[in-house]
UniProtKB/Swiss-Prot annotation:
It comes from Potato virus X (strain CP). Residues 695-862 form the (+)RNA virus helicase ATP-binding domain. It comes from the Viruses. Belongs to the potexvirus/carlavirus RNA replication protein family. This is RNA replication protein. SUPFAM superfamilies: DNA/RNA polymerases, P-loop containing nucleoside triphosphate hydrolases. One of its GO terms (biological process) is DNA-templated transcription. Residues 474-499, 513-563, 581-600 are annotated as: Disordered. Residues 529-547 have a biased composition (Basic and acidic residues). Residues 480-489, 586-595 have a biased composition (Polar residues). RNA replication. The central part of this protein possibly functions as an ATP-binding helicase. Residues 59-224 form the Alphavirus-like MT domain. Residues 513-528 have a biased composition (Basic residues). CDD domains: Alphaflexiviridae_RdRp.
Length: 1456
């Protein structure tokens, strides 16, 4: 599977991954449905893992609760297995509820028989009344089943059942017996059940639910070993067999075999006849346990509890490797190895025995005391066996040598859940003598003191069976008994042979006594299931409130809109109608146009003036149609080129005006005639229909249609292809957005009401809901999305609204497929965007849009709008009568609460991932009407068609805000002026320093942690594994032909050789580092990359802005804060030593090129644990030296933005900058959630991966802080034109820039929030490229589209936040006790300092770092795992032995 998994993980294409996931889901569904019967419950993660080990799947989304869900699931699974074994004929079920037949998938028509006896009071409620009997009747079927009862029965029950039921051949039985109880162990499946032991037995508690518990005696465990049961014919008495031989006895046998076993639940098959059965019966054992030998006297002082073999081996190797294993050291080691959650499973006495045993092993010599067979001559080798025999006899007389003691002491006995199958022979033993074979009952005190004197529980268990005895030995023993004892032996009960004697009498008595002895109560009934979420799709949606806009009142509801009066015949000019004060809903769609209200005409002179104007209008003959849709149309308007705008365009003449088909509602026909939209017959293009049908059949397009059966697709294409031709009456209505194309139709539908044979087909679900809202008095199924209409059928009249957004060929295919369609009505806009098919394989991708096909059947185009104001509409070439001025603005900032229009669907998904759910594409916004919209301009805008741009620009009624996130290219080419020397560019500013950090008041001193002790460890235990794989020096060094080998592996000390020493003078390493870390380019390519990544940079900034709580509007520039930040930067620089300032003279000179960078190799010791002893030396790191004024300028910029960032950042975000470990620890204790897994993030080549996208992000961030434009342009210049001796560098981050730390940190935050969907309130800590979160967030869906465009690649590390697994951040572990240095990394660094002989120089620093962990003392056992404890102990001992320490050494001396 590892190879297969590796292949699957190598797939990076999102489409391929989607296909794999779809295929996997199709396979998962039937499997989950199969397991739903036996496991419908909500399980814990641990229980689900255990169940999967038994082959039982768990639905992670199940919410059905149960008090012991895992145990009940196993019970159900066994019933399912049993159901597959039972014959399809009547079966007798005993002690079973009839409803459990469902789990067996049993046919209810089979007339099964139920025999249930009410043994306990709760059985009356458990079993249906009709299935309860007073005595178990004779079984008259071939097969029977006993449910979860056999473990309480005597063997006599099986004997008498088969003896008195001659028809019975097979008896299945389930029983619940944990095999580990034979060793008095804790439950091996604690997530399923637990065990409690008492003097006479134990209690099995499913799911820790006391109400489902029941008591077992240890003798019940005999059922785990039974293989055969034999008995004699009952016609003769017991004594009558004494004179018979073994062969003369009439023998009856049943064979018992284990059919299936899950945890403590087992299914037995008991078959009449003497058959073969395995000699050994094995039960599941998840872990390997051992028992130490009994070597101490009295035996009570030996280890009796089985212990994990792994733990025993760890303890044994520990005591044999340390120099002196003290008693306290061994106790400390035991504490490390035993999990905190498992400590309650051990008694203190057992731990004392275990430690004493290990101390005994530590004191013995492990060198053999015997001679070898290789030394000596012939005589010596000949006498060697004799000498060995004498030595062995001598040890028997005088005592064993240490070596022999050690070998015998470590001869651990494995605890195996495999038992030898036994035969229970009753031919010569009374059936009533079951109790004689039980162990003698002891009191609790006696059992504690004496039970193990004769051996452990395993021995007792193996002695308990008395039914596996040899028959001849039993017979001889019985003959030896005196006659008096034999004559008084109890006889079998007598009675009529044909009458069935109830064999459950003993069983009833036994359970009655058990019930009286136990004091437990039944738990509450199973918790109620969660109420199902009701489907709200059929509810009436609450009508949203409309927006109020200037010069535009509140929109009226559609129900209150007045109708349109027909123009009176015989008038010389039309009746004039005034525009309504309230026209349209600001949130309505294109089809939401409102009828005007009629007003009484004015005075006669007004009529005359109006008549004069009308006569001069080019469209005077179209005024009735224009008035019908709410336009006066008395004004001549012109576009920006001075061309007159005609409200009626694209007129088509010569179209026949046909009558409406029969059955067309009168109201609908009347409205269409009023608009001059009479139908005309259209011949459909069947080739377009066939292309669409082919794509649907082959599942190349669509969403819902892909789920249809293949036969449906065949039927669709077959019906279309069978038509020679198809004609249909059609009314084609074209008009601008907001012209009122659909309003008249909606008015007619409201008038028609319910009962019509009309279907409205919409391209989107949003538009369907809009129509349902505006025409509420019709059937909901009248309005359908286009795929639903194709699958579910339509009426005889079909209205296609916004049909340009329907797939090409769809209209033809639907009309051809549904032959009942008589009339189609098409509404759309030929000037707006059309449907775009993204599938390359689709045939319809090559078809022209539907508007081109049907435009020739549209009588005219209504080029007027009620939506846009006149100025904007005229610029778009559209007629409008809305007065006022449309507000146009442009900036790089986003407006809040305003819909955002972007050019690409990819950008839309990314923006929605930042929380901007009201984001639409230019094309996808068609149908939207809003008072304000903001349009994002990027490099994709220029490739958008005119139709798409018209859709975007015509959405707003009042304001359009353009967002330009790019830099001003003209300003970019302006260079910074030459700067003076250091003494002149250090400006004198007023001493208005930023407010310094004021530490919080000291908290009350907490009570110190209790002292502790950790076991002594081997000095090399941490680094030993790394040294074992260490290669030779020149095998690890980097080699180049020009400069030879590098010199990173130094000295002969293997400890020092683990660490790579990188030196600036190493030429080979320098050039290897340059090749690996630096990439060259040119200024033009860099700037081109910067511009091409604008789409990504603004997404990064929006996520950063949301994460850090920055205000939505730009932050006004503060000169006072800037000067204070500049003063801090200058003061920091001047605080350097005089030598450092003199060394920087070259970079302070005005002759030093502003864009010039000096590159050096950083000298350092590589101490990262993951890089210890690498087979090949890795390249080093570079340091860049910039022009000093450049560093100080951009350092000021970074500090300025940091000042505002700290003012706004949420409390759950911590940036480790100019803070102390105490600050971080206090923050973590207040904000970090330790109850769930956490995520730490690392990156691959973080500095080199910060390309143009990150630069774009930094520019937007600077603009949001209103940094002066000339500084932003200078920063872009230095990033795109940074020059080294090899040429111009590519855009990247360089160590030595002014804002390196702040920029790295902020890029880290932006990337993290762009990639992950981080829940609100999540604690986050950042510093440069390091970060950690207190949860494991999901990756945003939108990030998959962005991932390949970013060079930055993260390496998330998930920790479980439990002992030994805490999130790491900058070398610190974040724990429930606060932050502390990673003990392994601290120890590794300390060992390097010790090996170099420099420990005394830096001991104070190491003691301070160590103190953050050491102060917690005893709590460290709950925080560190074994390896971390080893490193911590060795660090403490090393510092103590060094003999010098002034910080925390006095406290450390108390450690050991």
């Amino acid at each position: 599977m590892a190879k297969v998994r590796e292949v699957y993980q190598s797939f990076t294409d999102s489409t391929t991954k989607t296909l794999i996931q779809d295929e996997a889901y199709r396979n998962i569904r039937p499997i989950m449905e199969k397991h739903k019967l036996s496991n419908p419950y909500a399980q814990t993660i641990e229980a689900a893992n255990d169940l999967e080990g038994f082959g039982i799947a768990t639905n992670p989304y199940s919410i059905e609760l149960h008090t012991h869900a895992a145990a009940k699931t196993i019970e159900n699974k066994l019933l399912e297995v049993l159901g597959s074994l039972l014959p399809q004929e009547p079966v007798t079920f005993m002690f079973l509820k009839p409803r459990k037949l469902n789990f067996m998938r049993r046919n209810p028509r089979i007339k099964d028989i139920f025999h249930n006896v009410a043994i306990e009071p709760r059985d009356v409620a458990r079993y249906p009344k009709e299935t309860i009997i007073h005595k178990l009747a004779e079984i008259e079927t071939d097969t029977a089943y006993i449910s979860d009862t056999l473990h309480f029965l005597d063997p006599s029950y099986i004997v008498e059942t088969f003896q008195n039921c001659p028809k019975l051949q097979t008896l299945y039985a389930t029983l619940v017996l944990p095999s580990e109880a034979a060793f008095k162990m804790e439950s091996t499946h604690p997530n399923i059940y637990s065990l409690k032991y008492f003097g006479d037995g134990f209690q099995y508690i499913p799911g820790n639910h006391g109400g489902g518990a029941y008591h077992h005696e240890f003798t019940d465990l005999q059922w785990l070993k039974v293989g055969k049961i034999k008995w004699r014919d009952p016609k003769d008495g017991l004594l009558g067999h004494l004179n018979y031989t073994h062969e003369q006895v009439d023998t009856h046998t049943v064979t018992v075999q284990l059919q299936e076993s899950f945890a403590a639940n087992h299914l037995y098959c008991i078959r009449r006849g003497n058959m073969m059965t395995p000699e050994v019966r094995t039960f599941g054992q998840p872990d390997r346990y051992v028992l130490p030998p009994q070597i101490f006297l009295p035996k009570v002082h030996n280890c009796k509890k089985p212990i994990l073999k792994k733990t025993m081996m760890q303890l044994f190797l520990y005591v044999r490797t340390v120099k002196v294993a003290k008693n306290c050291d061994i106790f400390a080691k035991v504490r490390q190895l035993i999990k905190s959650s498992d400590r309650d499973k051990f008694s203190a006495v057992e731990l004392v025995y275990l430690v004493s045993y290990m101390e005994f092993l530590a004191a013995l010599q492990a060198t053999t005391c015997f001679s070898d067979t290789l030394s000596g001559g012939l005589l010596t080798k000949t006498l060697a066996p004799v000498r060995a025999w004498i030595q062995e006899k001598k040890m028997q007389l005088c005592g064993l040598e240490d070596y022999v003691k050690l070998v015998k002491a470590v001869d651990w006995r494995p605890v195996d859940f495999s038992f030898k199958v036994e035969t229970w022979d009753f031919r010569f033993t009374q059936l009533g003598m079951w109790k004689a074979f039980q162990p003698s009952e002891l009191s609790d005190v006696e059992e504690m003191n004496n039970f193990f004197d004769d051996g452990d529980l395993l021995d007792c268990f193996t002695r308990m069976p008395a039914y596996a005895v040899n028959a001849e030995e039993d017979l001889a023993g019985m003959r030896g008994n005196n006659q008096e004892e034999t004559s008084t032996a109890p006889r079998e009960p007598e009675g009529e042979k044909k009458e069935y004697i109830n064999p459950a009498e003993t069983f009833l008595d036994k359970l009655t006594r058990k019930h009286n002895r136990e004091t437990r109560s039944r738990a509450a009934k199973k918790a109620k299931r969660l109420a199902e979420i009701q489907d709200s799709m059929n509810r009436d949606r609450t009508e949203e409130g409309s927006h109020k806009t200037p010069n535009m009142g509140e929109a009226p509801s559609n129900a209150d809109l007045p109708g349109v009066n027909e123009v009176e015949a015989g008038t010389t000019f039309p009746t004039l109608k005034a525009l309504p004060q309230k026209w349209e809903d600001a949130s309505s769609t294109d089809s939401s146009t409102i009828d005007p209200t009629e007003i009484i005409p004015g005075e006669e002179d007004d009529k005359a003036a109006t008549q004069k104007v009308v006569v001069g209008l080019p469209w005077k003959h179209w005024l009735p149609q224009l008035n019908a849709v709410g336009f006066k149309a008395l004004e001549i308007q012109r576009d920006r080129n001075g061309t007159m705008i005609m409200p009626i365009t694209e007129m088509v003449f010569g179209l026949d005006k046909e009558e409406f088909p029969e059955g067309t509602p009168e109201a609908l026909a009347r409205e269409l005639k009023a608009m001059n939209r009479s139908p005309t017959t259209i011949p459909l293009d069947l080739l377009r229909a066939r292309d669409y049908g082919s794509d649907v059949k082959n599942k190349r397009i669509g969403a819902i249609t892909k789920t249809q059966a293949a036969s449906w697709g065949e039927y669709l294409t077959g019906k279309i292809e069978s038509l020679p031709e198809r004609k249909v009456a059609a009314c084609v209505i074209h008009g601008a957005g907001g012209s009122g194309k659909s309003h008249a139709i909606q008015k007619a539908l409201r008038e028609i009401g319910k009962g019509s044979d009309i279907t409205v087909v919409l391209p989107t679900n949003e538009l369907r809901l809009d129509w349902s809202k505006k025409v509420p008095n019709t059937e909901p199924y009248m309005f359908k999305t286009y795929e639903k209409a194709l699958i579910g059928g339509t009426g005889s009249i079909v209205i296609f609204d916004d049909y340009s957004k329907l797939p090409p060929g769809y209209i033809e295919a639907l009309v051809s497929f549904s032959t009942k369609i008589k009339l189609i009505i098409l509404t759309g806009d030929s000037r707006q965007s059309v449907y775009h098919e993204t599938s390359d394989d689709a045939s319809i991708r090559h078809l022209g849009p539907a508007t081109e096909v049907f435009a020739k059947y549209c009588r005219y185009y209504l080029n007027a709008t009620h939506r846009n104001k006149k100025d904007l509409a005229n610029m778009l070439g559209v007629y409008s009568e809305r007065t006022g001025t449309t507000e146009i603005s442009m900036s790089s900032e986003f407006l809040e609460g305003v819909p955002t229009l972007v050019p690409s669907d990819e950008k839309r998904r990314l923006y929605m991932g930042t929380g901007r759910n009201d984001t639409f594409t230019y094309a996808g916004c068609q149908g939207l009407t809003k008072p304000k919209v903001q349009i994002v301009l990027d490099h994709n805008t220029q490739v958008c068609s005119a139709n798409v741009m018209y859709s975007a620009l015509s959405r707003a009624t009042d304001r359009i805000h353009f967002i330009n996130t790019s830099a001003n290219s003209s300003a970019f080419w302006e260079k910074l002026d030459s700067t003076p020397y250091l003494k002149t560019f250090l400006s004198v500013v007023r001493e208005h320093a930023l407010k310094e950090y004021e530490p919080a008041e000291a908290e009350p001193i907490k009570e110190p942690e209790p002292q502790t002790h950790m076991c002594v460890e081997n000095e090399e235990s941490v680094l030993e594994e790394y040294k074992e794989e260490l290669l030779e020096k020149f095998d690890r060094e980097i080699h180049s032909d020009a400069h030879g080998h590098s010199n990173c592996v130094q000295t002969e000390d293997t400890t020092i050789q683990l660490f790579s020493h990188q030196e600036a003078k190493d030429e080979t390493l320098l050039w290897a580092t340059i090749d690996a870390r630096l990439k060259t380019s040119n200024q033009e390519s860099n700037f081109r990359e910067f511009l091409s990544k604008r789409d990504i940079g603004d997404v990064l900034f929006l996520n950063y802005q949301k994460a850090m709580g920055l205000p939505k509007e730009p932050i006004p520039f503060s000169q006072e804060v800037w000067e204070a930040c500049a003063h801090e930067v200058q003061s920091k620089y001047l605080s350097k030593s005089k030598c450092n300032l003199i060394n920087g003279t070259v970079r302070q000179s005005p002759d030093f090129d502003e864009n010039k960078i000096m590159v050096f190799l950083k000298s350092q010791w590589v101490t990262k644990v993951e890089k210890l002893g690498l087979p090949k030396i890795k390249p080093g790191q570079t340091i860049a030296a910039f022009y000093q004024q450049t560093v100080m300028l951009f350092g000021t910029m970074a500090r300025y933005m940091r000042w505002f960032r700290q003012a706004f950042q949420p409390k759950e975000v911590f940036i480790n900058c100019e803070t102390t470990p105490e600050d971080m620890s206090a923050w973590a204790l207040s904000n970090w959630n330790f109850t769930r897994p956490s995520l730490a993030n690392d990156y691959t080549a973080f500095d080199q991966s910060q390309d143009g996208a990150m630069l774009q992000f930094e520019v937007l961030k600077a603009k949001h802080h209103c940094i002066p434009e000339e500084i932003i342009q200078a920063y872009i210049d230095i990033k795109t034109n940074a020059q080294i001796f090899l040429g111009t560098l590519s855009i990247m981050r360089l160590t030595g820039e002014g804002p390196t730390f702040d920029a790295n940190t902020e890029c880290n935050i932006a990337f993290t929030h762009t990639k992950f969907d981080i829940p609100a309130g999540t604690a986050q800590v950042y510093a440069g490229d390091d970060s950690a979160l207190d949860c494991v967030p999901e990756v945003k869906q939108s990030f998959h589209r962005l991932e390949d465009k970013l060079l930055l690649k993260s390496k998330p590390v998930i920790t479980q936040q439990k002992k030994g697994s805490w999130p790491e951040f900058c070398g610190w572990l974040i724990t429930p006790k606060g932050v502390m240095k990673d003990p392994i990394k601290l120890h590794v660094s300390l060992k390097l300092a010790e090996a170099k002989g420099e420990l005394r120089k830096c001991q104070d620093s190491y003691e301070i770092d160590l103190s953050y962990a050491y102060d917690h003392k005893d709590s460290l056992h709950d925080l560190f795992d074994e390896k971390q404890c080893q490193a911590h102990t060795l660090t403490c001992r090393t510092l103590i032995k060094s003999g010098r320490g002034t910080v925390s050494l006095p406290r450390l001396k108390n450690f050991l």
